Amino acid sequence: MFGLTLFLLALDQVTKWLVRQNLAVNEAWAPFPALAKYFTITHVQNTGVAFGTLPGLGWVFMLVNLVVLVGILVYYPRIPAGEWQLRTAAALILAGDLGNVVSRLRTAALYSEVTGSIWSALPMASVTDFIDIKIWPVWNVSDMCVVTGVAIVAWTMWRWDRDERTGEAMSGEPMTNDQ
């Protein structure tokens, strides 16, 4: 888990850094000009939560991120080794969670030089979003990791429920009345 998590965390932080270094806030770049009406890299500083919702409340989400982080670290060792889907989902959610916490702490630290404390700077903390597909709010690698991880968990739970309803145990063996 930690290899995938660290790779995705690094990818998230590097891509955010590249965007901040090369584009002004609200500036867009079309890496594929023929597709510019469908996809651009657009530099957005998001003080809200996922996909830019609830602006200014990102600090609340950061607290939720910390609870999720602890939950994953506690729950992960309990995931059976054969449940690679759930292990992958946990790694993805952890990477996304950490990516946005690191980003918010980075910007809060920058603002704390003005406000005098990191606590008073937390409401201004933001993450860099940049993937703009025009039909959805701008997002980043962390958002992609969390959404994909949650989708895998939902799919896995649906599959388990379906298997139970069709009379199959999680092992794939037909269920009997004494199971």
Residue locations for each model-derived region?
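Alpha-helical transmembrane bundles and membrane-interface segments of multipass inner-membrane proteins
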Residues: 1-179
